[in-house]
Amino acid sequence: MRYYTTLTLLITCMVIGLTGCRRDGIPTGGEGNTTEESKQTDLRILEVYYAGSEYSRVVNGQRFGSDYDDDAFIKIYNPTKEVKYLDGMLIATGSLDPAANIEVTATDGSSSGTADYYLKNFLVGSMLLFPGSGTDHPVQPGTAVIIAKKAIDHKAAFAKELGEDVGSYDLSKLIDLHQAKYSWTEGSGEIWVHEVFNASGIESSEEAANAWDPEEMSPFSISGKMALALIRPTVEINKIKEAFLQECKLPASDRGKAVYYRDVYFKSTHHSSRQVGLLLPNDQVIDAVVICPMKEKKMQILNLSLDKGFHGVKQTSEDKRPTYAGKSIVRKWDGKGFVDENNSTSDFEVKPVNPTTTIIRD
């Protein structure tokens, strides 16, 4: 009997082969031990710190608090077993507000019907471009990088700016980002991830070129009501820009066939509006998260394959500053890997900001 038992165990171990077998006969790999992280094939958004922190000042015995949002950042993580490169990648914000009670229409006519192109593509509101020729900006397996609004020690910089008046201020909650390698503000950080497109406030095709003009575009920012995406485009950004600028000159009747340019029409209960947008294919989006107060989402602004949910550090827009200051939305760790089911409601949680590239698994 012992001979057959031993033989059976040996055969079992041989069958599972590549998955491994412990000395006691229990498999060490295989489907039962597959983690979410092991299924991920590209970079992921790990943390988004967008609502900022706070500082206070005591005047005549009274404490007055203030917002501070120059310390925003995005943390990107490599869950794979191979080096990934940021060169030529885009960080993009969506053009639609998930908390808005609106309907996107096909044209500016109130009875033109609902449009769904923004679900078939990522409708870009603004975007940053990583520099590099292909292998200049690696992210090693199991490591993270921070892309900061300003890669500085915010407490030290603000204290220096205040000078002799610093004694009446409490700056203890401001964070140190001086070690962040990447920054979207020129002059801070080792590498400038510069803004290449921003359609904010641009409402017509005649003004569309301004979305690509550094002198005209609004500064890149992360709000509490938007989609945020990491995009690996298959077409060089200069070619996208060239095509967009040609398409915006098409007759209005032909613009619906454009690849990149889009007149975005939407209506609410009381009025209709128009803005300019840039379309990029969903299959070039390698990760996305919808940011929204937890009790305010009204509109699905991304294809469900990109994000079925949403997350935010606030419950409502009226939350008091102390309830959200110094907090991020962070991808959950399930004990095996960082969760990624393309559902930000369950994939993310609210945690105190971690302004370092140290990976916290808890």
Region locations from a protein language model:
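Bacterial N-terminal signal peptides that target proteins for export
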Residues: 1-8
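C-terminal motif of bacterial Sec signal peptides marking the signal peptidase cleavage site
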Residues: 17-20
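A structural motif detector for short, solvent-exposed N-terminal "entry" segments of globular domains
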Residues: 23-100, 198-272, 333-335
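Residue-level detector of short, conserved catalytic/binding motifs and their immediate flanks
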Residues: 43, 72, 87-89, 143-145, ...
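Acidic glycine-/aspartate-rich tracts in secreted/extracellular proteins
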Residues: 80-81, 150-154, 234-236, 282-285, ...
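Intrinsically disordered, low-complexity Pro/Gly/Ser/Thr-rich segments with frequent PxxP/GP/PP motifs
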Residues: 101-157
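Acidic, glycine-rich loop-and-strand cores that form catalytic or ligand-binding grooves
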Residues: 165-317, 324
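Extracellular low-complexity, O-glycosylation-prone Ser/Thr/Pro/Gly-rich "stalks"
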Residues: 301-362
